Amino acid sequence: MSLLLRLRLAKQRGEAILSEEKLTKLAVDPFEIAARHDIIVQAKPDTASGVSGMLLRHGNSFGILYASDIPNEGFQRFSVAHELGHYFLDGHIDHVLPNDGVHASHAGFSSGDPYEQEADNFAVGLLMPAKPFRKLMGRSRLGLEDIEAARDA
């Protein structure tokens, strides 16, 4: 399967999670989705430089740590959504966490690893699902309030 198709399917899987969870409105809260799946999410201590998020595994229990040293809610939400991608996408857990341990994701660079690219595309589909965004952007008169609503979503 081509990488382009894998990325498209990852984005669609992010959107499908919203349907499965019956979440139909913006803003999407990745912290809530994690909680619904008994995934503990916490801010990461500032000890691992350049790490934006981590997926942790102990047996069948999972946790997510996200970078708190970057005080940007959108960045933090994307980091959590990215780690959820590793959790929800087929084959990711076995690839990034074949045994108990920690998988660290790094921000600020474009990874050549298709699993990281898929997790990014999953996060896009989860946080910016096409239908609600099209509906928001389809209004006849867009103004500052609409732009701010899209930003906050």
What do these predicted ranges mean?
Residues 1-153:
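Active-site hotspot residues in diverse enzymes, especially metal/ion-binding acidic/histidine motifs
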